[in-house]
Amino acid sequence: MTRRPAHLLLSAAAWLGFFVVTVWTIAFLAGVVVPRTVDGPDRTTTARAVAIDLALLLFFAVQHSVMARRQVKSWLSRRIPAALERTYYVLVTDICLALLLVLWQPWGEQIWHVEGPVAVIAWSLFAAGWVLAITATFAVDHLELVGLRQAGWAAARDPGLTTDLYVGGLYAVVRHPMMTGLVLAFWATPRMGASHLLFALAATGYIAVGIRFEERDLRNTFGASYDDYAARVPALLPRLPIRRGSVHSPDPSRRPTPQRWTR
């Protein structure tokens, strides 16, 4: 693979943006550090705030989904180097999420507010959700997910390692560990306001729809192997421990391919 300086710089900028908006989103939902958070003092009328927030959420969802479609990727690949296709996706997603965080309008009353040990539990779950979501990006190859591998920062993956369905590690517990972590992070809070509730509901709904599309693609790719995996492992919520031997042991040597939904 040719390592072109322009490709390396642009992909590094996209990854840096990914890192910044991830930390920014954590602070946004936690209500710390950043000037505008998911809940806060009203800045405009409730109707206007709800309309703006819904528009921002829809804009992000459309961008995140449409740019992941094969037709759009094919169109884009005819106009930019193939090594930068993923980088452009990450970069545009960074910008759209940053716009949401900057333009978000807090509104409404507080839904719940807990303190003491319950608040500690809520914050612990919030942190655990983000740790799970971020850890899951490395389970599917973080460098490829953010476009660094394609741009030349690391060796290209061996195509032979992407032919099997990976069901080890976090994927032996739930089929979509990244989404499990995000949903947990969206809902685990000691202070839930109306605008936070809107964000959590919309984001969770988008994840649910995205999972359906992703699983359709995975079934088309892996066929009966994925059907068997889906029958044994839940999508988002881990099952209670079951008797040893009732689930096939995964082959830990099999590595996953970054899935469409992570796009």
Where are these regions (language model features)?
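Hydrophobic transmembrane alpha-helices
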Residues: 19-20, 24-27, 47, 56, ...
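Membrane-interface loop-to-helix entry segments
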Residues: 88-94, 118-133, 170-180
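Juxtamembrane/interfacial segments flanking transmembrane helices
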Residues: 66-74, 104-112, 137-153, 214
